Amino acid sequence: EIMNIETILSPHLEKCPQINELDEKKRKQLASIIGFVDETVGIEHLVKCLAEGTSMGGDGVIRCYVGFEPSGKAHIGWKVLALQLRRMIDAGTNVMIFLADWHAWINDKFNGNMEHIQTTARYMEDTFRALLGHPDEGDGAGQLRFVWASTIMDSGDYWARVLRCSKGATLAMVRKTFTIMGR
């Protein structure tokens, strides 16, 4: 076995001693999910979900995501990421790849040409499918799915939420977000 479970989990034990309470199968699943990544956000929650067989969706399916602004050709970094995503799929998580087409447009990728941005997003879908070995697609355990920002933003629910959040936001709150927005 390529992965040494204890080597992967030991850096997280101080922050999350509950890892030691997981049975061997769940420890192996956790090690596959987190792999050798530098940062694992919410490991305590993940361990709790594994221990209890629960999830945020209420169906026991652990979901993770990675997001991209469609902006160019595939490079070796995509393969490195795909190796980890494949381990996550094999460990029974649902992997969502978020294609941030509107974010790319805001940041003037392809000079703000949405048609080029969305062509690149479709290229990314095809590339990741191939890099991941064409896994089953859907919202279930061990499946892959792609979600586009434009699809979410076309939803009436999205705009209702934007308006509710905007109504409660102050100028000071908005200013705090500038550093993470990139503009």
Which positions does each model-derived feature cover?
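NTP-dependent nucleotidyl-transfer catalytic core
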Residues: 1-183
